[in-house]
């Protein structure tokens, strides 16, 4: 804010989410349940801020390609070159500005698919690892979320690669993606591109995000740490993201995300000391809004105790019946109308009436952080491709994380055993708390 003539500053790039225009109000402040910094936060911290409309959206030309490294990725590299030559940017060298990236969702994915070595640090929020896995996990298409995304793109007048619409149509109508559609989604990375990421990376992912759930950030972090570069990686799980936090929100959640983001940029972009050293390696908020930290990421050896929380059940008969007594949609006058109206209401997992239930009674004080493992044996006859697994918090009646896990089944009359990792959760057991595992016929 307020550079004098001849002064220079480090640069932060802030691409927007899908269906959103670049932010142009320099005084915009961070709101509740926010996953990142606002323009005012960045400028007040002493950074030049660059925002833009991604290709195919709003004032930009071209055709939207879903953060493809050969299209949107090259656009970002061109912006970095422009920042070096045409703005009052501090430089590391010729055509190499001191630059970091912040932003969420579509604006988080592009940070990992650009893979420009000039980028000094990234803070991808509520982003994906694999669009195929995120949008069609276990070959079960997320029809509600596809509808939300399609309406956002159409409402914004986006000009889109027609193969993307084709995939949405076949997914919605037939729960099927062609090889072409899968290839288009695969081209949006980051997956294999993560092997090239050297920029220090701080992930911010939502515990109640049913579009890009926690496992997407976990996979990204694992991939970057497997590189030989020694890249610093830290992670925050907050109550928010795609969807809505129905649980209590810690009053310091947003301010922590903002201060951590600025500290990350200060350390790795501006080079003003090492405030990022004080950021916990892993921090998360549980279902009651309580803040926790760890020196280990949730997938690293030593994070979990050797003896896990376990529960077993005797099973029963489950009918796979579309629409009736399944998981979702979200209902209730206590919630904002925007999340209880079609199609957003359909994106929430809820306690189901048609379900097999297994009691889970962990010890008070236990923390269940990560992906529960589920295994069961079944047989059946029918045309269904999957059942759904979810954990219900008996204290609130809500599904932990608002999220269910599709479990692929083969209903050929023979006995099968299936084992899956459920959606990651962050749950602390208090006095009187318990869970119910539900195996649900429809979500």
Residue ranges and their predicted role:
Residues 57-78, 247-257:
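Catalytic nucleophile-loop/oxyanion-hole region of alpha/beta-hydrolase
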Residues 252-443:
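C-terminal, loop-rich substrate-recognition/catalytic regions characterized by aromatic stacking residues
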Residues 224-244:
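Catalytic histidine neighborhood in serine/cysteine hydrolases
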């Amino acid at each position: 804010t307020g550079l004098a003539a001849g002064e220079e500053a480090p640069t932060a790039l802030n691409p927007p989410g899908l269906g959103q225009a670049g932010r142009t109000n320099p005084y915009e402040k961070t709101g509740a349940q926010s996953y990142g910094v606002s323009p005012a936060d960045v400028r007040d911290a002493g950074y030049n801020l660059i925002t833009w409309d991604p290709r195919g959206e709003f004032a930009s030309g071209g055709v939207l390609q879903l953060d493809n490294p050969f299209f949107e990725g090259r656009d970002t590299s061109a912006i970095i070159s422009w920042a070096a030559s045409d703005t009052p940017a501090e430089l590391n060298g010729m055509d190499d500005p001191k630059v970091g990236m912040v932003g969420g969702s579509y604006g988080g994915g592009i940070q990992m698919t650009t893979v420009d070595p000039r980028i000094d640090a990234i803070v991808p929020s509520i982003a994906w690892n694999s669009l195929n896995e995120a949008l069609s996990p276990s070959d079960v298409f997320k029809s509600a979320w596809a509808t939300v995304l399609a309406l956002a793109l159409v409402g914004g007048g986006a000009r889109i690669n027609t193969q993307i619409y084709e995939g949405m149509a076949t997914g919605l109508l037939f729960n099927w993606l062609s090889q072409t559609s899968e290839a288009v989604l695969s081209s949006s990375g980051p997956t294999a591109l993560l092997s090239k990421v050297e920029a220090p990376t701080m992930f911010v992912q939502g515990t109640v995000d049913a579009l890009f759930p926690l496992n997407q950030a976990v996979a990204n972090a694992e991939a970057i740490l497997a590189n030989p570069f020694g890249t610093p990686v830290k992670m925050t799980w907050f109550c928010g993201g795609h969807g809505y936090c129905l649980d209590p929100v810690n009053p310091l959640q947003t301010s922590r995300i903002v201060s951590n983001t600025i500290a990350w940029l200060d350390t790795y972009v501006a080079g003003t000391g090492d405030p990022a050293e004080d950021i916990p390696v892993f921090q998360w908020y549980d279902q009651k809004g309580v803040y926790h930290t760890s020196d280990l990421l949730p997938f690293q050896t030593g994070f979990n105790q050797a003896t896990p929380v376990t529960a077993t059940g005797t099973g029963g008969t489950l009918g796979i019946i579309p629409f009736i007594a399944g998981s979702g949609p979200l209902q209730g006058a206590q919630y904002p109308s925007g999340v209880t109206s079609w199609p957003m209401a359909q994106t929430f997992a809820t306690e189901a009436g048609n379900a097999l239930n297994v009691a889970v009674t962990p010890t008070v004080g236990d923390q269940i952080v990560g992906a529960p493992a589920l295994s069961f044996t079944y047989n059946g006859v029918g045309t269904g491709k999957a059942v759904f697994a979810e954990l219900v918090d008996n204290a609130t009646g809500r599904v932990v994380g608002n999220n269910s896990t599709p479990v692929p089944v083969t209903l050929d009359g023979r006995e099968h055993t299936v084992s899956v990792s459920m959606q990651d959760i962050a749950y602390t057991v208090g006095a009187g708390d318990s869970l119910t595992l539900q195996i649900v016929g429809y979500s």
